[in-house]
């Protein structure tokens, strides 16, 4: 909007490493989590716990009342976001769309009232960004975003509109956190953001508790072979995870591993019945076991412990880090990855599995044979080094350093309501 006065907000650095400061105080950070559960929620929970254990950061997580980790003692929660859950699909969809508009506004007002220094989006409601953008700009809050997926695989309503708004959200942020060099480059190319706003932080391992039952007992209960390697494909069945390519690779492999598929489909993605039919068509139905349901946390560790290795045959359109890979690292199970760029980069760097040359069945079969041979020969994978390099404490250390620089940065001018507004140069 033309004719608006220019606005400049100075960084609030009193008591935070500013010259002549007598007293240091923690940086006050409020996270925004839109979904009540899932991978991003778990990531935010682990990061908030690691940050909350530090003396230089004070953490609050703004979430829905049914957020799975709302009562975690490692940080403070504010459960004032509108819930998107409902047993009736149509009403759940309505709540989801309603919350796209309501929750960012609720969050921003909470952050301002709580005296927050930095807001950190675990999710961004880019669909409704024009609705809450002015409230964000006028708040004067510093903005950080965890970018788990640079692009969205599927639109909510309109792809062109949503891509435009997503890029706008990225550009208004003061700091963007990614998990790989590939994602950093992708973000620069996609949204045109400055490279110095992007910070690479590790995605830590996901613990799922103690394994109560012996691996052999779990295999017997699930009808899995005791005399053959078992590969685990775990998580939601999504098309870009390339389970079809993995099943087609099984008859091409010189080894004969058994595949356990644990998880269910969702939305417009193909479900378990499609993959059962495919296994029959390629002649490996007797070598694939389906556990086609939601897997509760208390069962996750058992499935990983009962498996010899974990299959992540994701296609190159899958450009985020994988929570499944980090569960595998926790339970010290090597992984098979294909051409998914972030996973390929991670495994090449850390020696915790085999990175295939592509995601087509032939390349996957070659990778399967290589990994089966390594497992059979008791290959020593670098899990200890991985857990040290990709730890939550290291993530929190790097993240807190960025927070400090955000508070000390010189203000930059961006648009307010179409004219000029505030941001920071980090």
Which residues are covered by each model-predicted region?
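Nucleotide-activated donor-binding/catalytic signature segment of Leloir-type glycosyltransferases, i.e.
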Residues: 272-298
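An aromatic- and histidine-rich active-site surface loop
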Residues: 100-108, 119-141
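Acidic donor-binding loop of glycosyltransferase active sites
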Residues: 302-319, 333
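A short helix/loop element that forms part of the nucleotide-sugar donor recognition site in Leloir-type
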Residues: 210-224, 275-277, 376, 380-381
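N-terminal strand-loop element at the rim of the active site
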Residues: 6-7, 12-15, 33-38, 49-102, ...
């Amino acid at each position: 909007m033309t004719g608006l006065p220019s606005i400049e907000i100075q960084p609030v650095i009193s008591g935070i490493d500013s010259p002549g400061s007598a007293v240091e105080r923690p940086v006050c950070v409020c996270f925004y989590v839109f979904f009540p559960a899932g991978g991003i929620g778990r990531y935010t929970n682990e990061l908030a716990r690691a940050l909350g254990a530090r003396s230089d950061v004070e953490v609050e997580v703004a979430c829905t009342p049914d957020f799975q980790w709302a009562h975690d003692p490692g940080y403070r929660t504010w459960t004032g976001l509108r819930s998107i859950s409902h047993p009736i699909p149509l009403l759940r969809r309505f709540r989801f769309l309603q919350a796209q508009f309501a929750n960012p506004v609720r969050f921003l007002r909470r952050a301002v009232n709580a005296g927050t220094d930095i807001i950190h989006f675990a999710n961004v409601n880019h669909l409704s960004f024009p609705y809450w953008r002015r409230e964000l700009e006028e708040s004067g809050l510093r903005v950080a975003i965890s970018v788990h997926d640079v692009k969205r695989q599927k639109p909510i309503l309109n792809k062109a509109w949503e891509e435009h708004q997503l890029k706008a959200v990225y550009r208004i942020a003061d700091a963007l956190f990614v998990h790989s060099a590939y994602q950093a480059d992708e973000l620069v190319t996609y949204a045109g953001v400055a490279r110095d706003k992007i910070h690479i932080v590790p995605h830590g391992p996901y613990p799922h508790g103690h394994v109560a039952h012996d691996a052999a007992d779990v295999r017997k209960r699930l009808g899995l072979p005791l005399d053959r390697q078992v590969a685990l494909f775990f998580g939601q069945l999504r098309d870009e995870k390339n389970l079809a390519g993995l099943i087609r690779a099984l008859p091409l492999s010189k080894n004969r591993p058994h595949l356990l598929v644990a998880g269910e489909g969702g939305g417009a993605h193909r479900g378990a019945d499609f993959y059962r039919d495919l296994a029959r068509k390629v002649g490996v139905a007797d070598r694939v076991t389906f556990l086609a349901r939601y897997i509760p946390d208390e069962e996750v560790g058992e499935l990983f412990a009962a498996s010899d290795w974990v299959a992540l045959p994701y296609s190159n359109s899958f450009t985020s880090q994988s929570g499944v890979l980090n569960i595998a690292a926790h339970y010290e199970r090597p992984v098979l990855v294909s051409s998914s760029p972030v996973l390929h980069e991670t495994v090449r760097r850390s020696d915790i599995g085999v990175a295939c040359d592509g995601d087509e069945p032939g390349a996957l079969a070659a990778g399967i044979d290589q990994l089966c041979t390594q497992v059979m020969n008791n290959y020593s994978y670098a899990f200890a080094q991985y857990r040290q390099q990709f730890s939550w404490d290291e993530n929190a250390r790097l993240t807190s350093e960025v927070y400090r620089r955000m508070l000390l940065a010189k203000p930059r001018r961006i648009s307010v309501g179409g004219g000029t507004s505030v941001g920071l140069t980090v």
